Amino acid sequence: MKKLFAALALAAVVAPVWAATQTVTLSVPGMTCASCPITVKHALSKVEGVSKTDVSFDKRQAVVTFDDAKTNVQKLTKATEDAGYPSSLKR
């Protein structure tokens, strides 16, 4: 039992080391006016773990920097979809 507790405690301490900041580009083709990026940026900024967003109307994309221990691409695309702007990972 003590070994199990020690292993769990070690994992809890080391886990944050595995987390990394990631930057992804999302394609957001539904942005049709100059004010759409404001809504998309607001939706993405509310996602826990997002540290930076750069939304471009001209390119119809959002560049998002986030902590992958707190969120993931699926949560980002869900946030834009819930705001009325479906998005997908741009490759």
From Swiss-Prot:
Keyword check for Repressor: no
InterPro entries found in the cross-reference section: Heavy-metal-associated_CS, HMA_dom, HMA_dom_sf, MerP, MerP/CopZ
Primary localisation category: periplasm
Binding positions (Hg(2+)): 33, 36
GO cellular component: periplasmic space
Regions that span the bilayer: none
Family: Belongs to the MerP family.
The protein, known as: Mercuric transport protein periplasmic component
Source organism of the structure: Salmonella typhi
Gene behind the chain: merP
